[in-house]
Amino acid sequence: MSLHDPSSSSQSEAVVPFIPPVLDADRAAAIQARLDAQARPPGSLGRLESLAVQIGQILRTEAPRLQEPTVLLCAGDHGLVAQGVSAWPSSVTTLMMQGILSGEATVSVLARQHGLNVQVVDCGVIDPLPEQPGLVLRRVGAGTADALLQPAMTPEQCRTAIRNGCEQVAGLPGNAILLGEMGIGNTSPASLLLARLAGLPIEQVVGPGAGLDAAGR
């Protein structure tokens, strides 16, 4: 899988790998027919039915089965925290990571109850944790730069981060992942990315963030 656009004359642009569409009307109809043939009222499984149809299309099978799902949590710190966008310091990111790895966090408890493997990926926190079971090191820096003052990442850092993600997922044992992220101040860069990708004003895409009400208090 190439991380570069071969049609581009410049290799400085980071390109997201192409993901082909998974919609297959014939397969979706076949899966739905299989569900409707069960001895129960049609539609009685609610959201589970549409989810089964969706997963079947993704896995390209009329009898989808999730195998060894992994919870993949990617952690990183954001330079925009210097602008006071969060009520907490960046050091809390590392504390959250340790809580998950020690099995004390909510996601850890839920994963344990359902027999799911949990991996915490250090993509670039300021205060890295020592090596330990469940921790994957794929750092592209000690946090990003302050996006208000300069680009948060270089093109090469972006390419490396995308490549790291592809490699991490490709190396997982199963056929399903549950994605999560953590990092103090993450609402701000997420809003910047969405505004840029969707071509929307920043005011329309930014939210109050963790611990704040709709008014941002």
Spans of features found by a protein language model:
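N-terminal loops that bind phosphate or other acidic moieties
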Residues: 2-217
